[in-house]
């Protein structure tokens, strides 16, 4: 099972780096890959984990003064197919999450 999450964060410089480290910490228990500037493909084992991540991101947004907006797709139990232009190895990491649910 996997889903996609993307966000906008209105912060710059070292503050942005610090906040992005906190986002990575929220995601760290889960296998995930970051593609593009703020686009993640995340593997989860249950819809409960999806909800836990959603609540953690909401809490993160409430705890900071900067604007933080995000979108999470619904959990997908089927193998995913994504298209676009990335480096070849980038697709291997995405497929490891989306194809081998």
What residues fall within each predicted segment?
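Short, surface-exposed beta-edge/turn micro-motifs
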Residues: 1-2, 36-39
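Short, extreme N-terminal segment that most often corresponds to the first beta-strand
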Residues: 1-14
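Short cationic amphipathic helices and targeting signals
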Residues: 5, 40-43
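Charged interaction segments
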Residues: 20-24, 28-31, 36, 43-101
């Amino acid at each position: 099972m996997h889903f996609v999450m993307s966000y906008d964060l209105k912060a710059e410089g070292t503050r942005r780096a610090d906040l992005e480290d906190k986002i990575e910490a929220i995601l760290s228990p889960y296998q995930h890959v970051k593609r593009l500037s703020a686009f993640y493909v995340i593997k989860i084992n249950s819809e409960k984990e999806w909800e836990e991540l959603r609540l953690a991101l909401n809490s993160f947004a409430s705890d900071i003064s900067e604007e933080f907006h995000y979108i999470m797709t619904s959990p997908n139990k089927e193998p995913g197919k994504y298209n676009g232009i990335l480096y070849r190895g980038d697709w291997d990491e995405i497929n490891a999450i989306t194809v081998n649910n």
